[in-house]
């Protein structure tokens, strides 16, 4: 079952050695089944054979990594090669010709993608950025046209080139062309700026959908070590033509969920990773069967350390039926090392927490970089230096306010943050964990102010135990919100990802427009698409910057003309959130039909 998809550089991954992993300090109940086999020296299932099928030496396009979960809960990573992102130009003025298409291709090489460098050649005559080009006819989704238009389609060797070209040609709506009328060629860039969406649409796969592969080029049993580039149980290479969706398999593979929360010693204001240490990492490991978290089999773990000669950590308050495992380290670096070992052993599919995207995970990654602990620098299933540094994200709201935050990528693992999830579906006076837990769970947070954390940690073993219980309580509340019947976040993400055919990571951070666009692109591939089998493309649009002076006014709703469609022919609507769906249903009409009739 597909968990995540990412695109990396064009370098083909070479065969790796897979030494036996060291024995984990954790019991079998915390370890994934496949990892447990490796620790005991038992073999596991191989995918395909050892022989590598080398790609075309002149075509080393981007590698697409598919992360998934097998029915036995083991993780798998497949490198897919041979799929190239495409960039399209719609010809809205002038005459399309192969000569013009080639001239624009040369312009792309020399100006749009050259970045001041001389384009290198594959075999003496093929440019580096463009793999191939072709002319085709297709429909434009916006603006709507009754007849297909001419398009130039370019297959690119780099995934990031798609968005670069789209942004470049948006600023150049016309180009000089001696063969077109008036010597001017009008163009509109069309593209999914996300090359992974192109791959998923072309392959017919969806988020959390089942995928099969044939002719696996090579496979590796992941007898993992801390130096490997991937921590999955199985790895292999395959051509993109061998990827097939399994549409008749509706089951949801068991998912490994990990709730997480951290506590830091803060000075004034928010803590900073380069100065303020992490003193406690609280984690709850559990499983989600058919998208529903199993509440009866949760493992509570506390990672902590204490000042030298301070007496360690006292007995953590707990209920009679509750068990808590405490991993007490000598210092912060040793605590991070133990936590990294736990991540490798348990191999979670989903992280859950309140503001885990905006604080906990970026802070852990940044702090691990400061301490030099490899195991936590990469909280995803891919270990490379380029993925270890959190990125600064700037969001602009409708009122013009901007907000900056850090985000750490975790390839192969989903970050399910209860804070933005609830903000998108509920309107609350306060979105703090305490307020939300009190309203939906009937249970509030323990009252420990941030200014009290430092003194309590230094005071005594008993006060440190109180902080550990406080941290673990936050993890429980976050998981409680994720499992609450009002949200059912894991099941909601799984089913919505399958329905909209959008991968989970993109689903959680994008709006409704991306969902609708992906649905239309997938539907346009079906043989019964009206009016023909030609593809449908969306133009690339740059987001318009907003200022505080912008004013927003609600739309005026007008009743459409009756009789645009027969009453025995129902229609489907795809509006986001407005009155139009109810108007369409009551009058059995659409605004597009009325527009066509009037013109």
Per-region residue spans from a language model:
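Long, charged/polar, low-complexity intrinsically disordered N-terminal extensions
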Residues: 1-153
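N-terminal accessory regions of nucleic-acid-interacting proteins
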Residues: 2-23, 29-31, 129, 138, ...
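Proline-aspartate-enriched helix->loop->beta-strand connector
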Residues: 339-363
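Active-site-proximal helix-loop-helix substrate-binding element of RNase H-like nuclease domains
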Residues: 298-303, 307-326, 330, 347, ...
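Alpha-helical interaction scaffolds
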Residues: 203-256, 262-336, 340-344
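Common nucleic-acid-contacting/processivity interface regions adjacent to the catalytic cores
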Residues: 4, 216, 454-598
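Short secondary-structure boundary/capping segments
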Residues: 170-171, 273-278, 360-375, 380, ...
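Short helix/loop capping segments that flank catalytic or ligand/cofactor-binding pockets
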Residues: 165, 267-269, 292-293, 362, ...
């Amino acid at each position: 079952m597909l968990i995540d998809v990412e695109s990396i550089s064009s370098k083909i991954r070479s065969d790796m050695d897979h030494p036996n992993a060291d024995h984990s300090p954790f019991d079998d109940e915390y370890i994934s089944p496949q990892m447990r086999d490796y620790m005991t020296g038992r073999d596991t299932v191989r995918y395909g054979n050892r022989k590598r099928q080398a790609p075309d030496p002149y075509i080393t396009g981007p590698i697409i990594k598919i992360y998934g979960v097998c029915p036995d809960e083991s993780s798998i990573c497949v490198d897919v090669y041979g799929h190239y992102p495409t960039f399209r130009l719609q010809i809205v003025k002038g005459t399309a010709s192969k000569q013009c298409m080639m001239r624009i291709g040369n312009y792309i090489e020399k100006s749009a993608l050259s970045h001041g460098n001389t384009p290198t050649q594959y075999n003496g005559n093929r440019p580096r950025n463009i793999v191939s080009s072709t002319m085709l006819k297709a429909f434009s989704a916006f603006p709507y046209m009754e007849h297909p238009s001419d398009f130039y389609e370019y297959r690119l060797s780099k995934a990031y080139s798609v968005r670069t070209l789209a942004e470049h040609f948006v600023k150049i709506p016309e180009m000089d062309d001696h063969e077109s009328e008036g010597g001017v060629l009008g163009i509109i860039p069309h593209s999914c700026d996300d090359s992974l969406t192109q791959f998923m649409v072309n392959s017919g796969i969806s988020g959390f959908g089942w995928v099969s592969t044939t002719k696996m080029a090579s496979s590796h049993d992941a007898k993992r070590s801390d130096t490997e580039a991937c921590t999955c149980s199985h790895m292999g290479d395959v051509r993109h033509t061998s990827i097939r969706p399994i549409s008749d398999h509706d089951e949801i593979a068991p998912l490994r969920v990990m709730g997480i929360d951290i506590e830091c010693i803060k000075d004034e204001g928010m803590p900073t990773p380069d100065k303020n240490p992490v003193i406690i990492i609280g984690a709850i490991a559990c499983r989600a069967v058919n998208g529903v978290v199993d509440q009866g089999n949760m493992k509570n773990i506390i990672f902590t350390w204490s000042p030298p000669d301070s007496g360690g950590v006292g007995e953590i308050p707990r209920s009679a039926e509750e068990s808590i495992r405490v991993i007490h380290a000598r210092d912060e670096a040793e605590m991070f090392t133990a936590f990294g070992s736990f991540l490798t052993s348990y191999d979670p599919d989903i992280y859950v927490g309140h503001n885990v995207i905006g604080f906990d995970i970026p802070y852990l990654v940044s702090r691990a970089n400061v301490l030099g602990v490899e195991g936590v620098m990469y909280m995803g299933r891919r270990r490379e230096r380029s993925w270890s540094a959190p990125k600064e994200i700037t969001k602009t709201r409708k009122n013009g306010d901007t907000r900056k935050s850090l985000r750490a990528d975790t390839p192969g693992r989903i970050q399910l943050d209860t804070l933005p999830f609830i903000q998108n579906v509920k309107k609350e006076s306060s979105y703090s964990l305490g307020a939300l837990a009190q309203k939906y769970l009937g249970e509030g947070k323990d009252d420990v102010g941030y200014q009290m954390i430092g003194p309590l940690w230094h005071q005594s073993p008993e006060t440190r135990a109180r902080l550990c219980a406080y941290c673990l309580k936050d993890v429980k509340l976050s998981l409680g919100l994720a499992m609450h019947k009002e949200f059912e976040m894991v099941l909601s993400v799984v089913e919505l990802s399958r329905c909209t055919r959008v991968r989970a990571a993109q689903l959680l951070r994008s709006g409704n427009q991306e969902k609708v666009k992906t649905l239309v692109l997938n539907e346009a591939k079906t043989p019964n698409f009206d009016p023909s089998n030609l593809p449908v493309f969306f133009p690339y649009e740059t987001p318009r910057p907003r200022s505080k002076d912008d004013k927003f006014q609600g739309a005026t709703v007008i009743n459409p003309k009756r009789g645009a469609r027969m009453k025995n022919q129902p229609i489907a609507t795809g509006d986001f959130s407005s009155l139009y769906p109810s108007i369409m249903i009551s009058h059995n009409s659409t605004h597009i039909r009325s527009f066509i009739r009037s013109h």
